[in-house]
Design a protein with these regions (language model features):
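Residues at secondary-structure transition points
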Residues: 12, 53, 75, 79, ...
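A conserved amphipathic terminal alpha-helix motif
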Residues: 98-126
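Tryptophan-centric aromatic hotspots in well-structured domains and transmembrane helices
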Residues: 18-21, 30-31, 71, 82, ...
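Structured surface interface patches that mediate subunit assembly and partner/cofactor docking
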Residues: 26, 39-40, 115-116
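Hydrophobic-ligand binding "helix-grip"
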Residues: 32-35, 42-101, 123
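Hydrophobic ligand-binding cavity/cleft-lining segments
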Residues: 1-35
Length: 126
């Protein structure tokens, strides 16, 4: 198994970045529509377009600091963890998308896709 690990500086306070990760309307602006709620045990789906509805479950929540959930249960069976750290006048957002099969198309595809998605977060908050 292998992971994708990235970080992105966002010139907004952690509370705003947290909303981009946990507010369904904001999440849909930069990534995918879904009924996410930052509550441990909450089961939700993310609409990944041609890849279909992906089931998820919230594993860990530390408001404005950490959010972790399963992603694509029964298909990819990966875990997405977001970590937020205040930095200067904004937030350093860390992403760890863990549990990919080494050399898989999903690892390559998501590894190529995540950097552009992370850059969209700041625009979604504008």
């Amino acid at each position: 198994m292998t992971d994708i690990e990235l970080d992105q500086f966002i010139a907004r306070e952690p509370a705003a970045v947290w909303r981009a990760l946990t507010d369904p309307e904001l999440l849909a602006r930069w990534w995918a529509a879904g009924d996410i709620k930052p509550i441990v045990g909450h089961r939700f789906t993310l609409d990944m377009g041609s890849w279909g509805q992906q089931p998820c479950e919230v594993l860990e929540v530390d408001p404005e600091r950490l959010l972790s959930y399963t992603f694509a249960e029964g298909d990819l069976d990966t875990t997405i963890t977001w970590r937020l750290e205040p930095e200067g006048g904004g937030t350093r957002l860390f992403l760890r998308h863990a549990g990919f099969v080494e050399g898989s198309a999903a690892l390559t595809g998501m590894g190529n896709g995540w950097p552009g998605l992370l850059r969209r977060i700041e625009h979604a908050l504008a």
